Amino acid sequence: MANNIPIGSPVRTKAIINRYFVKAKKNLGQNFLVDQDAILGIVEAADIQPGDQVIEIGPGIGSLTEQLLLAGAKVFAYEVDDSLPEILHNELPKKIGEQSLNDRFKLLLKDVLKADFQNDLAGFFDMKQPIKVVANLPYYITTPIIFALSESDLHFSSLTLMMQKEVAERLEAKPGNKEYGPLTISVQTEMNVKIALEVKSTSFMPRPKVDSSVVVLTPLQERPKIENRKHFIWVVKMCFSQRRKTLNNNLKALIPNAKEREALISKLGVDPRVRPEDLTIDQFIEIARNIPAK
């Protein structure tokens, strides 16, 4: 009977935790998702279809993995906790079936930030076809993972990521919003951002201190023309180095000459007293174009 209960249900999760003596590791940011509606919401937000190739980051005890596989996906999972493979290989076949699991699931004990996607996925995924990324991310590595994925050579069609609500709001922020900053600009020059659903802290075991959001990121069809992305990101970060100061003040470190600085601000068509959070992405691109790359 227990085999018919989803891994992500509170009763099954508790049974697995007790059977395998699992303890959520704070240093890995582990919180097990025990809200089946939220789990199915992630699968729906990612628009998982039979045959989809999915990278899952941090499968944990398999709550989301199970539903991805039941939806027909082929799943390649990255995990850093070496105590979890036994659980995944014992529990997933109960609803998926041993043969189907062998054909459609592969687990690699590796930090995704050290991933070599081309080599890791070769032989399991068709690298000519789009790949989806789905993950319930540990809060402490959310931003590094987003940067790593957006800058990788991975041909992905979407990233569906559970993250801290505050980070999700930063990704979706518009100019003039206090959450708008370097992360916002870096992501929005590469991807469309959509918050698909909110997930309360009560949906996790153990319960975190903050709520979460599920964000869907999809590559822009037409990206802004940025000649040197590394230089652009550096300029943006410099402009936000003292975010409560005016643009004119923040630009002093980049353009020491007052007349040159005034000319650029005039070219942007903004008040010198404007703060960086009020500038559009196009205006940041224009600033970067007028500052020599180092």
UniProtKB/Swiss-Prot annotation:
What is any Pfam family matched here?
A: RrnaAD
Q: What Gene3D superfamilies does the database record attribute to this sequence?
A: Ribosomal RNA adenine dimethylase-like, domain 2 (1.10.8.100), Vaccinia Virus protein VP39 (3.40.50.150)
Q: Name one GO molecular function term.
A: 16S rRNA (adenine(1518)-N(6)/adenine(1519)-N(6))-dimethyltransferase activity
Compartment(s) where it occurs, according to its Swiss-Prot or TrEMBL record: Cytoplasm
**Enzyme Commission number(s):** 2.1.1.182
What PANTHER family does UniProt report for this protein, alphabetically? DIMETHYLADENOSINE TRANSFERASE, DIMETHYLADENOSINE TRANSFERASE-RELATED
Q: What is this protein called?
A: Ribosomal RNA small subunit methyltransferase A
